[in-house]
């Protein structure tokens, strides 16, 4: 279960989340819709502790995402999300882009992440583009 209680976030003086409160049950699928700049991506990133927030509380399966003791890679593995646009880093190679999330979100070592990434590149016939 995901639970948000009065979550607010600002970028400087601009408030992008205003006292957001909701509960999402395990297995429930939620689509976040709205116009450009309405805070959709910020909301999703905040739930996954990829973006800090200034006020309120967020819990995933009873664990507070803002608690420094929370195992964030484990927490993130329990919340599925699909972004509208991929956020790739143009200064990184294809392999580096593939491994970054595995290291940061799944907690894999760089070597484990590279092994997995190369396996999937090979599977889809893109090994020539790995560098």
What does each of the following model-derived ranges do?
Residues 33-35:
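The feature captures the beta-strand-to-loop junction immediately N-terminal to the Walker
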Residues 48:
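Helix-to-loop junction immediately C-terminal to a conserved catalytic motif
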Residues 57-59, 63:
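ATP-binding/catalytic-site motifs of ATP-hydrolyzing domains
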Residues 63-64, 99, 110-129:
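Conserved ABC ATPase "signature" region
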Residues 65-80, 110-111:
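ABC ATPase NBD coupling module
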Residues 91-101:
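Short coil-to-helix segment of the ABC ATPase nucleotide-binding domain corresponding to the Q-loop/switch region
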